[in-house]
Amino acid sequence: MSFDSLPALPLDPLPDAALPTAPRRRQTVSVNVGGVMVGSAHPIVVQSMTNTDTANAEATAIQVAQLARAGSEIVRVTVNTREAAAAVPELVQRLADIGVHVPIVGDFHYNGHLLLREYPETARLLAKYRINPGNVGAGQRHDENFATMIEVAKEFDKPVRIGVNWGSLDQQVLARLMDENAAAGHPKSPTDVTIDAMIVSALDSARFAEELGLGHDKILISVKVSSAPELWQVYRQLAPLCDYPLHLGLTEAGMGMKGIVASSVALAPLLTEGIGDTIRVSLTPEPGAPRKLEVEVAQQILQSLGLRQFLPQVTSCPGCGRTTSSFFQTLAQKIQDFIRESMPEWKAKYPGVEDMQVAVMGCVVNGPGESKHANIGISLPGTGEDPRAPVYQDGKLLTTLKGPRIAEEFQELLEKYVEERYGQGVAQG
């Protein structure tokens, strides 16, 4: 068959409806969490949580600072004992002393009604209270204890997150819905009933909080499970039923690669549907691994979806038989680390630097092309190629590097480019 006999392909542009667009956010109210605005009118917020004993204010302050400097915009701490509650003022002061100003959220289970009343200064300093309606108390005490926490929130003008978890669901609500389901003509599966119970628990708690006088714009909701399909189901059912901001995350994502993949798979579909106003990636840290990894993964999920831009994107090839060594991989990692370490200073001095594109390529096949498309890029020599590395800036050849200091010289060129390209707005202002 000759190519001439093949049917012509349509070259008409796709209709607008078929073109990919940024997801339209589900409309929600705006909630102020210690100066960070959460809701559909604002960027999706990255949260994290410490794993230190909050009673150890020094260790907790160190970890909060690490998380905040990595880019966490809200940090949650466990408040589970009197010692932990008593340590919150010291924690906040330690953070202020080192110039870290990030909203601190108190995570309460079982005894939050007692701790918030006994430690009013802690209640005043926390930016938000997380309340789990599944473990605030049983029977009459459930409503009494919940009401106490809401009264404290009203007194100190604080928002609350009604945080329902699959593993600690209100058993009274679940039992009632299970009984109703058993009597139905076409009963649902236990999983579906459990998801219904999570939604009922969350919305009933939110309505009760409003009946107690808490403002509609003081409430956020989460309904967390530990698997992606159930997370999609519960949030897709919940989203049309309210306009409270929703916090997304798996309860337990797992460790390492498994946790990163599970969180990415779970969150991405909802975020692309416009569901979700804050996110947390709940990774189990590997031994010796920094806690801040959960922040970096959350940022990368949002950045990969085009929902936020946190730091310049480094494009690098995976490597193949054409590459002479792993040098380009080492350089790509060095540049990525250099950018992340530099971002706190760059973000303050150079507006727009987070949109910069950097390319670190390993051979002549795609290297020059990718480097030209980036703001600044380097194409390292592959097997059999001339041992020189051309550097492209804004699509044009800037210089050619060679010798043992290629990495250091490219880093210097990158820093100079940032100063010249993104420092103009500062100089003009």
Swiss-Prot record:
GO terms for biological process: isopentenyl diphosphate biosynthetic process, methylerythritol 4-phosphate pathway; terpenoid biosynthetic process. It comes from the Bacteria. Keywords: 4Fe-4S, Iron, Iron-sulfur, Isoprene biosynthesis, Metal-binding, Oxidoreductase. GO terms for molecular function: 4 iron, 4 sulfur cluster binding; 4-hydroxy-3-methylbut-2-en-1-yl diphosphate synthase activity (ferredoxin); 4-hydroxy-3-methylbut-2-enyl-diphosphate synthase activity (flavodoxin); iron ion binding. Its EC number is 1.17.7.3. The keyword DNA damage does not apply. Pathway: Isoprenoid biosynthesis; isopentenyl diphosphate biosynthesis via DXP pathway; isopentenyl diphosphate from 1-deoxy-D-xylulose 5-phosphate: step 5/6. Binds 1 [4Fe-4S] cluster. [4Fe-4S] cluster binds at residues 317, 320, 363, 370. It catalyses: (2E)-4-hydroxy-3-methylbut-2-enyl diphosphate + oxidized [flavodoxin] + H2O + 2 H(+) = 2-C-methyl-D-erythritol 2,4-cyclic diphosphate + reduced [flavodoxin]. Belongs to the IspG family. This is 4-hydroxy-3-methylbut-2-en-1-yl diphosphate synthase (flavodoxin). It comes from Deinococcus radiodurans (strain ATCC 13939 / DSM 20539 / JCM 16871 / CCUG 27074 / LMG 4051 / NBRC 15346 / NCIMB 9279 / VKM B-1422 / R1).
